Amino acid sequence: MSRIAIFFPGIGYTMDRPLLHFSRRLAAEMDYEIKPITYGGFPQQVRGDRGKMEECFRLALRQSVEFLRDVDLTAYDDILFIGKSVGTIVAACLASQSAARERIRLVLYTPLEDTFTFRLSEAIAFTGGNDLWVGGKESRIAALCAARNIPCTVIPDANHSLETNDVQKDIETLREVMERTRQFIVRRIDKAIE
């Protein structure tokens, strides 16, 4: 069974940050070919500025399309798109347009509302209960997930990095998020073995 995991980072949340670093390690342990995308050229002070956010999406989308130009997704049996923040929008957009869309599963770390403007087939989401990028305590992410039957874990008091001011709590949160991510990934592998 051929497997690939493509990573779509956030604006400032790169592959060396905990959520993406450990999810990459999980996927590698399960024999996924790893393809991390890197972006560049984003504007500064994006949060709260719709125009700058759209510019970030366009830049990330263009760079992702270029990065994936020579990757034939239809050659893979199992495809993971793992995104963080703006990367979740790019991942959802590309998944919805892909000829292999029925084989693409998405892991959405702190998705933004625009992520849900695209058709998502199989996904899991994680959001912070105090994520100011999506309205903090007024966030609609959990409701958007529920409307699409996407399991969503809300981490109380966590910010856009799924962190709080309590280091021990953050370590436990990371452990919980990685375990749920692992279970999501393993489900497809287990089905293929049956």
Task: Name each region found by the language model.
Residues 64-121:
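Primarily recognizes the serine-hydrolase "nucleophile elbow" in alpha/beta-hydrolase
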Residues 2-76:
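Serine-hydrolase catalytic machinery in alpha/beta-hydrolase-like enzymes
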Residues 20-21, 121, 134-144:
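Short alpha-helix in the alpha/beta-hydrolase fold that links the catalytic acid
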Residues 158-173:
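Catalytic histidine-centered segment of alpha/beta-hydrolase-like enzymes
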Residues 125-131:
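Short beta-strand/loop motif that positions the catalytic acidic residue
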Residues 33, 105, 149-151:
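Conserved beta-strand segments of alpha/beta enzyme cores
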Residues 176, 180-192:
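C-terminal alpha-helix
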